[in-house]
Amino acid sequence: MTDNNIENKEEEIINDIAEEVENTEIADLKAQIEELKDKLIRASAEIDNTRKRLEKARDEARDYAITTFAKELLNVSDNLSRALEHKPLDASVEVTNIIAGVQMTKDELDKVFHKHHIEEIKPEIGSTFDYNLHNAISQIEHPDHEPNSVINIMQVGYRIKDRLLRPATVQVTKKT
């Protein structure tokens, strides 16, 4: 072998090694790129999920922020309703004016409740007792109604959107 052949052989080996090293580096870099792309996709998805959770928490906080205040107003609404249920039929003009004022106050309170998605839970007589919405305080035998039916409403309940503020207090029928 001549020196020229040896040099060519060495150069060929060096080129092969350089090409192999370059291919290995390219493959490693491609793998790193794919790994980083995957991490970016996962991080982006996590950011989206976090944003959605925060939006949901913000919406719930806004929707239910008045829950405590609303619970305190329920008794006011009950008292206004009771006052209107017991108005005298032969009332004087002054009493009639007071009753009209109480009615206007109750109507205004009902508008505020409606505005803030607070609604009454007033089951129909004979409807099936629902432990999610009703609180049974007693059971009464009644031949005209199925067992576990609402027979009397002692106090209306309320909910704000889908959250219960106060269950309706009811009496239910029992088996005879």
Curated annotation (Swiss-Prot):
One of its GO terms (molecular function) is protein homodimerization activity. Pfam families: GrpE. GO terms for cellular component: cytoplasm. CDD domains: GrpE. Participates actively in the response to hyperosmotic and heat shock by preventing the aggregation of stress-denatured proteins, in association with DnaK and GrpE. It is the nucleotide exchange factor for DnaK and may function as a thermosensor. Unfolded proteins bind initially to DnaJ; upon interaction with the DnaJ-bound protein, DnaK hydrolyzes its bound ATP, resulting in the formation of a stable complex. GrpE releases ADP from DnaK; ATP binding to DnaK triggers the release of the substrate protein, thus completing the reaction cycle. SUPFAM superfamilies: Coiled-coil domain of nucleotide exchange factor GrpE (SSF58014), Head domain of nucleotide exchange factor GrpE (SSF51064). This is Protein GrpE.
